[in-house]
């Protein structure tokens, strides 16, 4: 019996898996979102003026929002007038030093870049649970250090380390949850996590509204992380990972444990051993020496890069709207919420599926960004008054949020279990490169006001078109090994493809191109080449 069949016996989404979903897709994502966007408040610039002429850095008079916070020391000529503190007022990151706020954001995503690729390989080797728990514990520690750091260089270092842990453990937690539930619930779990990430942005804005000291704010948000860590100590290891590693007894015990916690009366069963094609030695060569994985990976790397670039680029650009920073941040998160129910409906619709939804959201989001250059301001009164740069930017944010949600789910289904975490880590690595670059894209407006949106739009449309070259995974069984990639059930499904999945293996041979024995031998040769390269 395969793992998927065993999960049907013990429960694909029972009581305990609902608890795991609440822990890893709700509570954890609320905390992860906080650490990911915390710099939007910690790095906010309070209104200020120069004591010599009461003028702000750009030559306009500063606004009074609350008690004055005069600067001290060598920066004593600066007076901050806001009713909140930030790293800007702490270390005087104004004027020529203002760029250092963007650097702190890029440093974080640089850490995430390291985390997603290194944690992927670590969890494939040492297990999902120990790598996830260790990463979460270290993130809480480094985040507390970040709140207490006395100097800006140490602040940058701890932000980098928080990024490493946040990016790495979030990816592993996502895979761990998916490998503990039935494949038919992967989309729901992924959408729930993305939904809670958006809620986490609004939650952080609410907390920041009441806590105006950046140090106290950065410290208290880790209470949630510590609570999630305590609850994570008792979760099981992934049965799919144990099975892929050839640890059949432990995999069976893990599945039986899920059954008991789901209150299922499960009879004994025996898992079939799997080919040890790359379970113990998978690395980047395993992916790029396989033609199918290589094509999928190259396309998905660009898609992940674009999703991150446009998502964070539009988020940072929303800061130019003016008004209350807490309200703007909350709306930025809440604006994503409509994307997820729509996304859930479309990715499970047989006429759209994963591939069609991803391509559609990317193209619509990119098209909205391109339209901004045609309507830079308000278009007047009447129905067309809603067609302005702010509305189109919000539409782009909504669509790219949906695409970001789909790309996690879709990537999980494109890779076999033996390299799933590694493959997602490689793709997610390029997403973080997009995050590193994103803080600097809005600065292109100094060359031409529409240039940032042209970049976002062109990137989104190109990624959407390229994603059409990928296979559809809706209703297809999850591949476990490299050999499964060439099996008929894993090929692109036709309208009646779902029915084909239940036909005997002998009948499936009629739907393949060429001899199935030749395909299997070719795949085994590829596996041997991978092992030889390692």
UniProtKB/Swiss-Prot annotation:
It holds the Pfam family Sugar_tr. GO terms for molecular function: transmembrane transporter activity. InterPro entries: MFS_dom, MFS_sugar_transport-like, MFS_trans_sf. The chain crosses the membrane at residues 22-42, 97-117, 136-156, 161-181, 191-211, 216-236, 297-317, 327-347, 356-376, 391-411, 424-444, 450-470. The keyword Transport applies. GO terms for cellular component: membrane. Belongs to the major facilitator (TC 2.A.1) superfamily. Organic cation transporter (TC 2.A.1.19) family. PANTHER family: SOLUTE CARRIER FAMILY 22 MEMBER (PTHR24064). Probably transports organic cations. This is Solute carrier family 22 member 15. It comes from Xenopus tropicalis (Western clawed frog).
